[in-house]
């Protein structure tokens, strides 16, 4: 029988726990809100100053206008002919085009309230600014607590590299490279990875996993491949069953789910992948592009750069690198919990 005194103590503990949870939620909300607000303020000149970008944005603008033309004129908007480049080129036949089609649809559905030029600038601005939300949501879906996820979102936009075409602002802003499709993939990739990981573990959620993974692939082929390879590594992370007879069965179950997911994504994107593979002999790589963009820089370059703090904090105090080292150590210390091994696996794999 519960005495009144015991009931009062239990009730007080419940109220205290509820207050702590609310406080944690408030702190997490403020941290993510600050990260987004900082990006919105810091990047506002990208849309406030209307000047032509001195980078690849010009080509992406042409592709967006081509998508608008294809949709409005009833043409095959998945494989139009771009006659404004050289003697003409079927860009969408060889190049991921979901970002262009999405921007074109926004332009049409908003009754052309904004020009394609303005839409490309505004979507770049908003996607970059909202990237912390993508990281926060994805970490929560993987199983991290609110504060850890909020801290991930807080620092998500703070990397600085020496022009490595990565996730930092230099890849997308006016003074950078203007890699518009990669920006879409960068924002969609974390949720895709989180949802797909849940499919591997629980065997449910195939629809959203297929949708997000296909969106990542059709925004940037390399980023879609990154998700698939990462999921292949994550199938080996059921550490709670590492020394039991269940381990092979769990691994096999996860691989079957990954293969099902792979087949579904290939079917959804086959309209693009099949012609791309069949017509691959006609696609040539530019001799002007650095081969390291495709082959990586190798350990001989990356490890010394990481040790010097230049890989994530180029030309500044290595604050992000220090936080990375601390987080890596915490994850290793908690290796028995599977979710903490996910950052370790991803970082170790793609340091290549």
Which residues does each predicted region cover?
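Membrane-embedded transmembrane-helix bundle of lipid-linked glycan/lipid transferases
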Residues: 2-3, 8-352
């Amino acid at each position: 029988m519960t005495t009144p005194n015991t009931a009062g103590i239990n009730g007080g503990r419940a109220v205290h726990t509820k207050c702590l949870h609310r406080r944690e939620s408030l702190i997490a909300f403020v941290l993510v809100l600050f990260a987004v607000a900082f990006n919105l303020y810091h990047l506002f000149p990208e849309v406030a100053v209307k000047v032509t970008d001195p980078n690849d944005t010009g080509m992406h603008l042409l592709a967006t206008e081509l998508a608008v033309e294809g949709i409005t004129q009833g043409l095959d908007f998945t494989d139009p002919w771009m006659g404004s480049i050289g003697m003409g080129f079927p860009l969408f036949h060889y190049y991921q085009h979901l970002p262009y089609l999405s921007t074109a649809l926004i332009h049409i559905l908003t009754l052309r309230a904004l020009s394609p030029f303005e839409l490309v600038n505004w979507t770049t601005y908003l996607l970059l600014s909202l990237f912390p939300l993508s990281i926060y949501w994805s970490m929560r879906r993987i199983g991290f607590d609110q504060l850890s996820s909020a801290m991930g979102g807080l620092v998500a936009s703070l990397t600085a590299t020496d022009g490595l075409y990565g996730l930092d602002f230099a890849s997308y802003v006016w003074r950078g490279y203007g890699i518009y499709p990669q920006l879409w993939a960068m924002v969609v990739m974390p949720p895709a990875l989180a949802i797909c990981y849940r499919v591997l573990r629980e065997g449910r959620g195939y629809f959203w996993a297929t949708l997000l993974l296909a969106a990542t692939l059709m925004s940037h082929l390399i980023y879609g491949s990154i998700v698939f390879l990462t999921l292949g590594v994550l199938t080996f992370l059921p550490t709670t069953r590492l020394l039991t007879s269940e381990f092979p069965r769990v691994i096999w179950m996860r691989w079957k789910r990954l293969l099902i997911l792979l087949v579904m994504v290939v079917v959804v994107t086959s309209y693009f992948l099949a012609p791309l593979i069949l017509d691959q002999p006609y696609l040539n790589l530019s001799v002007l592009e650095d081969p390291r963009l495709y082959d990586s820089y190798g350990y001989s370059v990356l490890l010394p750069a990481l040790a010097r703090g230049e890989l994530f904090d180029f030309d500044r105090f290595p604050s992000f690198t220090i936080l990375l080292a601390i987080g890596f150590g915490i994850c290793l210390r908690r290796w028995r919990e599977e979710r903490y091994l996910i950052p370790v696996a991803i970082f170790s794999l793609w340091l290549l």
